[in-house]
């Protein structure tokens, strides 16, 4: 039958590009991406992790956007006011580096341009990037409320940043001081501890002799950086180290510099490292810095910010660090103070952005005092007010919070939130939410703002509430804070997640979200991390162009689970594309066979397969809801795919075809509509475009409440337990098992598609029920005639017949109906001969003592397993 005449003819193949453009524009025009203002239900809120403006869309973004869109679309279908607030991050150092490189190609520097003109160049580059990010998310089907889109340098976030900075400063939680920081010489800025990647590098450890001032001997120290000895202000030993008991309190003369420095005792010294005595350079080592504070040691900086040696380096002033090292080692050797050099592998910090070696350096910077802020953030997770998924990351979060250090928030950049601090020539420092016009102390108008900007993560930490209008008490803030779920990658739990919790509780006195869902990384199909150098990067936009958005979404989320990495390769992408095509073809078959009028679902008297598919549909619905509530979106997706392809398409539709050809049969159309409408709604969060397109064709056949609704806002299916039918599932299970066994038998014996096989089915008590489906068994298994008999068959397989023993059913198939027995006998005979040749060869090899002595055990075991397999196969073939 033809489909309803009021509808356009369905295309034979799914045209993704055309469908995606049409429906996304339609959803935007209808305002579906905005939270429903009329709903009295509790809002469901996700604030999008703002992607950096520097980046092209990659698979990580695709996974994030898809998982968040799944949640938003699901909760929208549950009737909740669903808000997904999008945005982008100004990306601080990463963005500035890109623009500076562009200027360098033109022979210009930011210093030559000046701050104002350079920032104009930044905005010229950033604005198109923001447009690109928005367009890329739209192509992914992201149902964000684009009218609420926020950029971290928009006026709202700028106001929020100044508010929190001023508040924390007034509480004594932000301070400016000389502290040891991580200095990136290439980016020319301080970076936080979290922005330093530690890599194990092969190096050396130098043992240096420092002479005691009283001439009584030497103290030998071990160091991996001999050039820093020029800034030493002490030698430290452990107070319990008996080797140095008499030396503590004495002085040594620092070689080359001839500076008198003390021998001190400190419990931080590792007695097992080197000689147990260490040089202390407070200005160039984090541990030494803390030791220097404890012992009031001078802090002598010997390097400039470009890592060349400064005037404090004595004879090495003006040298590079490498040249300085060579000079120091040579000089100590000539003085007889270099005891030995050993190979040594040690951890060296590198800038996460540019990979330059990080230089620990004492510098005047702005810091946040984290310990008082961390306590309530830790309690929020410990008390369960915030749940972290998977649970194992809770321990990671707790450990970091319990050992937190002060956060260096100033960056020597121009692009970002400029620190809201001004300096007056009179010495007054003004911290203000607004630009001051005059010094409150002397009245001077000659104020200079601090040149530094804030760490990008400082503004990102305010994201859940600054995007909703804070510090103003807006209606959005009242309605949508706190958020429901924070979904992001597990690798930024410290960078971003922890800081949002800290800032949210500080500003709002309430947690910023209830659940933290951490997804894993997407690796290639071999489990390798994707990188341009490896050539294994998959461009999601190219995948969309080739296979469509729904296929990409289905592929990136398939097999995912909270916190675990997943694999993605061509095989999975093609499988997702095939599922899209399967869904289209199956739906097209159903819709093209629905006729002109709606058919109502009978209240009773449904055939077995109808009761079975309705029972399975409701069980699958219950499973999907449970799994989605547990954030197991990958598993819910697998359950759905198995049902759609493995039960609805492969079995129910095939059985329905038999009835559609028989006018006397009970019509399967109402059940086809019921199940397909449920499938489309269950799949919509995962595959929004194809489901909306198919829904548009199905709507005329749906009940009025559904037929007048676009699927994006249609009610999400709920399981009806009264439809669970264990009897129907059991009987259909047997029917499916019989057909599948016959299909497998055909495949094993390479039976031509045009050839029918014969079968006797001994079904015991189920014979009468299965007899009602004789035609279906014959059609689906390409078997004819099929005899369904009572009782059971006790015989075994022979050369003339195959006996398949199923669950309480025996299927007997004469070999003559599948193969030419004479030709088959010759084939088996030839196969046995070949196998026996292999057995003879392997037996000889495994009897060879030289082979057994020289070959790896794994190779021997592999050969032995192969031999056993050949022997078992010969035995099986001879038995037949």
Swiss-Prot record:
Motif 'HIGH' region per UniProt: ranges: 51-61
Short name of one Pfam family: tRNA-synt_1
EC number: 6.1.1.9
Keywords attached to this entry: Aminoacyl-tRNA synthetase, ATP-binding, Coiled coil, Cytoplasm, Ligase, Nucleotide-binding, Protein biosynthesis
Main location: cytoplasm
Any one Gene Ontology BP term: valyl-tRNA aminoacylation
'KMSKS' region (motif): residue ranges: 529-533
Reaction(s) catalysed by this chain's protein: tRNA(Val) + L-valine + ATP = L-valyl-tRNA(Val) + AMP + diphosphate
Entry-linked PROSITE patterns: AA_TRNA_LIGASE_I
Record-level GO cellular component terms: cytosol
Localization in the cell: Cytoplasm
GO molecular-function terms, A-Z: aminoacyl-tRNA deacylase activity; ATP binding; valine-tRNA ligase activity
Family membership noted in the UniProt record: Belongs to the class-I aminoacyl-tRNA synthetase family. ValS type 1 subfamily.
Enzyme class: ligase
Residues where ATP binds: 532
Residues forming coiled coils: 815-854
Protein name as it appears in the record: Valine--tRNA ligase
Written domain comment of the UniProt record: ValRS has two distinct active sites: one for aminoacylation and one for editing. The misactivated threonine is translocated from the active site to the editing site.
Its biological purpose: Catalyzes the attachment of valine to tRNA(Val). As ValRS can inadvertently accommodate and process structurally similar amino acids such as threonine, to avoid such errors, it has a 'posttransfer' editing activity that hydrolyzes mischarged Thr-tRNA(Val) in a tRNA-dependent manner.
KW Amino-acid biosynthesis (keyword) present: no
The keyword Kinase is assigned to this record: no
Subunit structure, interactors included: Monomer.
